Amino acid sequence: GWIDYSKNEIIEQFNAVLSFFSVSSVDAYHSHYEIEEAEVAFRMINTGDKNKHNVNAWLRKGEIQANELPTIEFDATKFKSALDSIKTIMANHPDNFFEQLQSLCLQAGVKVVHTPCLPKTRLHGSTRWINNTALIQLSNQYQRNDIFWFTFFHEAGHILKHGKKEVFVEGLQYTAEGQIKEDEADKFAVKYTFSEKEEETLYQKIFNEEDQVKFINQYAKEINTHPATIIG
């Protein structure tokens, strides 16, 4: 697990939890995470059936994973350029796709980590800046190719379009103000995965095809995307 509960003494287990969150007391935990929650909450309607402590733990694990990666100064131009190469990785989906994705982003100063979801979180991903370094945290919760890649490009949109002080957590409900930025990130992701123009072209042709699955696979290669993003 993420926290060492091997010690028998309750106080030692308690200290292990504090150590995981890098705080010295329960009050320090609430103080730190209430500030983080406030940064998100002004755009959130509610957390629904999500456990906020599990959400905090998931976010914290992402920070720990990010700290294990080298830090490189962020370069927006290089990151935007890398997205074209990442689109090709998405289309081909090699076995080491995540390592390639992580490496290309890191060269542009963006850390990308994969953190499995905890119970009662159901989060797709998150974007935030930690010590002036961009972090994209992905869960691949549903183990679906299309959701994974859409979430990545959505988070990339937040990095390129929105402020460094903002925290974005996908899988939560947002206020009208916050939803505007979510919609902007969605539109950004659509351009890289399966654009509206590409979708329109598909619908103009597919109903005349006898083998629609074969056509989708061919069309995906033509527009440099993965068939799963088309089928959705």
Regions found by a protein language model. Give the residues of each.
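Short juxta-domain linker segments that transition from a proline/glycine-rich
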Residues: 1-151, 156-232
